[in-house]
């Protein structure tokens, strides 16, 4: 029973396919923007779990994986990829440094105003 469900999950490719199989409602606008982030977070939640899927029924697995996918999806409903830091590029990103004052230095002050006079031919 559970093996056939797991095989179905292994064959899924698109994020929408996971949501349909697990019967999780979603906003297509959120999914379009964060599909890779949601699927990676879903994978992270599965990896962090310690459930023995071999002893579960298909319905139990559907509920279990559905709850993890829904949790991953909700992470991005009211948040951003930068805040959630799913991928390495965001995890390693340094916080913005405070702005420093930029001073203007005129060319005249560097080379002297008298040297800038143009010559007419």
UniProtKB/Swiss-Prot annotation:
A Pfam match: NifW
Oligomer and partners: Homotrimer; associates with NifD.
Task performed by this protein: May protect the nitrogenase Fe-Mo protein from oxidative damage.
The protein, known as: Nitrogenase-stabilizing/protective protein NifW
UniProt gene name: nifW
Keyword tags: Nitrogen fixation
Family: Belongs to the NifW family.
Keyword tRNA processing found: no
Any one of the GO BP annotations: nitrogen fixation
Keyword Translocase in annotation: no
Coiled-coil regions, chain positions: none
InterPro entries: NifW (IPR004893)
